[in-house]
Every structure is written in C-alpha cells, then in structure tokens.
C-alpha cells in the first residue's frame, strides 16, 4: 500500500513526456500508488521501456505515442486510454522541449523554431486538457497538474515566456472547469538534475544558480513527486488555480 492508501487504486492517470526524466518518475510514482498509468511520449520506444518497467514491478501501464502539439494526436491518446482502461481521472502535462533547446533571444530566435517550441511547451497542455476533460467529467471530475518552472519569474527568454503561459493557462482552465469538479494546479520546479538539463544548461551557469538557492543544491526528479501526488489526491480537493514552487527556496514571494 502506498503513501495514500488505496486512494489511487482503480484510477487512471496520463503522464505526458513520461519516456524519461521527470515524467518517468511521475509515472512510476503513480503506478506505485496503484493507478493505471498511460506513459505518453513522442518517443514511443522510451515510453514502452518505462511502461515495461512499471509492469515488471507489478504495476499497470500502457505506452502511447503522442505529439502534444497535434490536436489529433492528443485526442488519439485519450481514445487509447479509454479503450485500455475505461476512463481518465488524472492528467500530468509534463511534455516539453527542453533537452537540446536552442538558447536565443526573443527578438532573434528563428520564427519557425519559436512556433514549434511554444506549440509543445505551452499549447500542448491546453490540447491535452481539451482532449481529456469531458472524459474526466463523466467520472465525476478529476485533477490536472501542469509543469511550470521558476523560469516564469526569471529571465529565461522564450522558455520562461512559455512557463508564464502555463501559469496563466492553469488559472484560466481551472476557472473554466471547476464547475465540473476538475481541479488544475501547476508545479514550478527550480533547476532539476536531469539529463535534459545537463545537455542544455552550461555547467558554470548551473553553479551560479545553485549559489542563490538556500538549500544549496539542484533538485532531483524525486523531489517533485510529493507535490504531484498531493495535488492529484483527495487531500487537495479544495485546491485549484494555484502555482506551487518546488525549488529549494530559489523563488520566494510574500
């Protein structure tokens, strides 16, 4: 029995960007709590490996290929989930372009790259929510967690802009869907030690960032799990429209 007892038993969760990194850890944690998990990723081989690992530990998982920037692909993800598990209770919008991201200024970034980047990193959360919310409502409601970032409060060019958009999207959708008992919140991690981060952020920049964090270290993907599970759980049943920093104290607001 997991931390939340049998609360997640017989529930169905979709985690996008779950073929590795933070999304993988979210998917594995939900499976350990008893949820059936759809491991959704544009890299279907990575998703299948994660799903196989979950099933190897006695969990229930399905790998699904999804391009979150494509409305039809998001709808197909929802359809495959319904066909396999019969419903949808939770969605974690984690998919993003980050590893290998082109660092550039807003005034000079290639326009086609910018549009693709925003279609995944911001619009993807909207398209996946649109694909699943009616299915959640049919089950009496549900919960959605969006992945934001402390980059929303720092200068981070178009990556930070996308996360500002995620924060606004979280609050607007939570307001629209609250009447259907669908709660939507966001987690804003600080710098997390993942392969994607190691290939994108120069290490001297990482060292400077860590100097400004009260807990004096980068986060680990596992540091985000507690907040994700809490926000999906019934313990958070009166919490919606909120952005929660999980960042070692990097950003503090009064």
Language model region names:
Residues 2-4, 98, 102-103, 154, ...:
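Short C-terminal tail/terminal secondary-structure segment
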Residues 134, 175-179, 237:
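Alpha-helical segment proximal to the catalytic Tyr-Lys
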């Amino acid at each position: 029995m997991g931390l939340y007892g049998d609360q997640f038993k017989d529930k169905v969760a979709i985690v996008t960007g779950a073929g590795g990194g933070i999304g993988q850890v979210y998917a594995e944690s939900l499976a350990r709590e008893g949820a059936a998990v759809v491991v959704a990723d544009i890299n279907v081989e990575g998703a299948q490996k994660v799903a196989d690992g979950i099933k190897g530990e006695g969990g229930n998982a399905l790998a699904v290929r999804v391009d979150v920037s494509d409305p039809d692909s998001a709808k197909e993800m929802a359809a495959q989930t319904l066909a396999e598990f019969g419903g949808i209770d939770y969605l974690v919008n984690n998919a993003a372009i980050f590893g290998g991201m082109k660092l550039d200024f807003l005034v000079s970034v290639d326009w086609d790259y910018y549009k693709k980047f925003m279609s995944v990193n911001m619009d993807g959360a909207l398209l996946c929510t649109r694909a699943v919310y009616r299915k959640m409502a049919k089950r009496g409601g549900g919960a959605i967690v969006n992945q934001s970032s402390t980059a929303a409060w720092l200068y981070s060019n178009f990556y930070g802009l996308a996360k500002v958009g995620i924060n606004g999207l979280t609050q607007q959708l939570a307001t629209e869907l609250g009447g259907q008992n669908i709660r939507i919140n966001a987690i804003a991690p600080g710098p997390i030690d993942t392969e994607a981060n190691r290939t994108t952020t120069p290490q001297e920049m990482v060292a400077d960032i860590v100097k400004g964090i009260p807990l004096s270290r980068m986060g680990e993907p596992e540091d985000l799990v507690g907040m994700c599970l809490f926000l999906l759980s019934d313990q958070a049943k009166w919490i919606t429209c909120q952005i929660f920093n999980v960042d070692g104290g990097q950003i503090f607001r009064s």
